[in-house]
């Protein structure tokens, strides 16, 4: 049984840096507790001090595979691994204890993962809906995977933000690489953002041929609730 729970990042406007770092917490919220959990998250993260180069996003996960149990996710992301680490280490004290105690009994499970984006395009076109495609890739092939993605993006022109990255902590069942794309609305998300012409279709086919070592694992979609 797959237990894929993975990053999805709501990437902010951090300039042109190619690398972004994330730390994500996934919740399986019990039925009827969604509003209470959303309020607890908002009450805590809307008041917490954080570095200026770090953003936090809270999302629900309405579309996923049958074995993907998480219903919500909290994403922390920054172009600085130091900022991300310092912020995570700062989550302690009385307010933190009240927040975590309030969450108990309202969620069935919780899990954290971390990783980093290695290549991306359209950082100025991040949408509130995001879909992740997860792949199992041997560590020795990670560089080839990112190189193939970067090559594809020279020809393929997506409407929104698209990125490729790796899971560095907390992954399971061999999942190691992710491609993530955002949409501005549900119609755009349902349309899928596939190739718009033969040139893009050929580039996509070449990409799949160049990553024939990768095994597709699963996909899921998140919808942003709040951003901090």
Role assignments for model-derived ranges:
Residues 1-2, 197:
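Generic cytosolic/nucleocytoplasmic N-terminal low-complexity/intrinsically disordered segments
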Residues 3-16:
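Sec-dependent N-terminal signal peptides
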Residues 17-228:
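Short S/T/G/P-rich N-terminal loop/turn motif that feeds into the first structured element of a domain
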């Amino acid at each position: 049984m797959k237990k894929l729970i993975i990053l999805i990042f709501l990437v902010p406007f951090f300039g042109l840096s190619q690398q972004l770092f994330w730390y994500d917490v996934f919740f399986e919220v019990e039925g009827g507790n969604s509003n209470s959990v959303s309020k607890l998250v908002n009450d805590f993260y809307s008041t917490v001090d954080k570095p200026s180069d770090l953003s936090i996003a809270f999302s629900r996960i309405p579309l996923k595979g049958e074995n993907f149990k998480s219903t919500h996710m909290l994403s922390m992301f920054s172009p600085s691994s130091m900022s991300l680490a310092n912020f995570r280490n700062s989550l302690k004290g009385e307010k933190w204890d009240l927040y975590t105690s309030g969450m108990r009994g309202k969620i069935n499970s919780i899990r954290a993962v971390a990783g980093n984006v290695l290549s991306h395009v359209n950082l100025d076109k991040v949408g509130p809906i995001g879909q992740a495609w997860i792949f199992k890739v041997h560590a020795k092939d990670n560089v080839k995977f990112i190189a193939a993605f970067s090559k594809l993006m020279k020809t393929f022109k997506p409407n929104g933000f698209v990125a490729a990255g790796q899971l560095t902590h907390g992954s399971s069942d061999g999942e190691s690489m992710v491609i993530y794309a955002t949409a501005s609305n549900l119609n755009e998300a349902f349309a899928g953002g596939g190739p718009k012409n033969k040139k893009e279709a050929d580039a996509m086919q070449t990409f799949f041929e160049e990553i024939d070592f990768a095994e597709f694992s699963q996909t899921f979609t998140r919808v942003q609730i709040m951003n901090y």
